[in-house]
Amino acid sequence: MFKRISLRFTIAVLLAILCASLSSKLEAQNQSPRQGRFAAHEWGTFTSVSTANGIPQMWSPLTGPSELPSFVYHTSGRCGKGSQRTLALVRMETPVLYFYSDSNVRASVKVAFPKGCITEWYPLARAESQTIEWNDFVAQPGARENFPVDGSRSHYYPARETDAVPLSLGDEQKGEQEKFLFYRGIGFSEVPLSVKLKDDQVIIRNYGPDEIARVILFEKHGGKSGWRIHEALKGESTIARPALDQPLEPLLREFEKTLVGQGLYEKEAAAMIKTWRDSWFEEGLRVFYIMPRSATDTILPITIKPQPQELVRVFVGRAEIITPEMEKQILTAAQLSCENSPEARATAINTVRRYGRFADPVLREAMNNAKDEASRVSINELMKELAKPADRQ
């Protein structure tokens, strides 16, 4: 009898050890790259803006930490007169593609954007309006890192804070090196999630065929913030606007947990959050959601040669909502800017700047509805002033 009990106890202990070992191995896979594999990991964002009643807006950013270093290549007008000021439904921002390998790998990448336009990229690539190709670059584990810098405080740089291998294009003297492949663009098709504000309820709807793994509703006003999480969205759901009494740090941990759960390594998730923290959690009301992989592959089909043994693509959708409160404050500021007073104009700029890049559609509508030409000119000048960096105003 005692032998049977002892045997059962031994088996139970061995099973517990085995489960713990498997759990730790699975956890470790999300913390750092696996050895002996050629892998590619990508993260990026899709940003859209809609009115409170859910109408998608054509928009261009007025302000915000989206400026890129001077060495980044751009379209030189192929997507309009300055991609930053070109109106679009969706802005595809900071996709970065990392590679992992134990030995040198010569590779090529092609990304298509059928319903959009590629606007910026680095390193040097063959870029046309709807496609971008990096041909014959080398993933070089252990190579001396000699990445370009321009002395700016661009949010581009935190994306380098990962264990990805350096990538080199061209020869050592005239070539370029970076920790990732970077590209950005503007799109003209709607995203799979719509948002609508009704009283204190946010109505979210998944129009796509696949489940959206996680949705985060975030709101911030006057320095106070709150958030709510909705899991596994299919069809339509309603989320109450949060009380603005929650600290940000728990949300940052939830964000990192979400990104790692989708396949990013911990350092990649941390780099993404560091890149976007200032912009993601500014004043306003917005919905974040994990783009279904099928939607990402449809919007941005990608080809990598040689084919990696692992390809992870994690895109965060950001749906900005123009609330009635936000619209009222911006319109009041627009009227204030029409007064012939430097003090009034400074107040208008400070009011609108709180809403970062997303005041554009409200100001554009105010300009269209202005009663006289002088008001239209004043609002247009306000928009131009807001488009400048803060230190040049």
Q: Which residues are covered by each model-predicted region?
A:
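Bacterial N-terminal signal peptides that target proteins for export
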Residues: 2-12
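Protease-labile, long low-complexity intrinsically disordered regions enriched in Pro/Ser/Thr
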Residues: 29-393
